[in-house]
A protein has these predicted regions:
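Carbohydrate-active catalytic/glycan-binding domains of CAZyme proteins
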Residues: 1-216
Length: 216
């Protein structure tokens, strides 16, 4: 059976990784995805030289076509501020724009650990807007941080990881909030599984029984 190529994004030049979809005011779906040259002899290890693209589709599942290259970066995650601007996180930086189809300005977040140990560094960040309009962020190590408006300084509010209390090598958390609660899925590369967690406030998390997904 041939592979279904209309789901997501296909390209003979770029090898894509990750991806975050946001519906724009133009009614189209925008996939923010990073990629490196398919021709690279390093293969996946070329990821430090990734670029971030804005790919567009009329459908949520694609096919997406890369419209423009935003700049260098890896592991993109996009979110929208209360004032309508878009923030595109990448490892060790972020881009900001007034127009999802416009030009993006590069900058960096400010972090204040507040005399707490930073858990496994600040990479692979994931964000969710809180009920009061502030933003919570969970970093790769499982520490929680809060910013007043999503761009202002992020302050660490935990001194231990929020992940399940089991031995594991956790990374790539993804958090979001719906009208009821906060949700998180996090990978454990040691156990080769992923866990699903829930929270009422985005700070104290409960791990649901079972696994979000596992090999096979």
């Amino acid at each position: 059976i041939p592979r279904y190529i209309d789901n997501g994004i296909e390209d003979r030049i770029w090898s894509y990784w990750g991806g975050n979809i946001k519906k724009g005011n133009d009614g189209k779906y925008h996939l923010f995805v990073c990629g490196w040259l398919e021709s690279s002899t390093k293969g996946h290890m070329e990821w430090p030289n990734s670029y971030v693209f804005n790919a567009v589709s009329d459908n949520l599942t694609g096919p997406f076509v890369a419209r423009n290259m935003i700049g260098k970066g890896h592991n993109p995650e996009v979110f929208q501020l209360k004032d309508g601007r878009y923030v595109l996180y990448v490892i060790d930086g972020r881009y900001v724009t007034d127009n999802i189809n416009g030009n993006w300005e590069y900058g960096k977040f400010d972090f204040n650990a507040r005399d707490r140990r930073i858990i496994e560094g600040l990479s692979n960040l994931s964000f969710a807007q809180r009920e009061d309009g502030s933003y919570i962020m969970v970093c790769r190590g499982g520490g929680s941080w809060i910013s007043y408006d999503g761009l202002s300084e992020y302050n660490q509010i935990t001194d231990k990881r929020v992940y399940p209390s089991v031995e594991g090598r956790f990374e790539d958390p993804v958090i979001w909030r719906d009208h009821i609660q906060y949700h998180m899925i996090v990978n454990d590369w040691l156990g080769r599984i992923a866990f699903y967690l829930r929270s009422k406030d985005g700070i104290k998390w409960v791990t649901d029984p079972g696994e979000a997904y596992m090999p096979g």
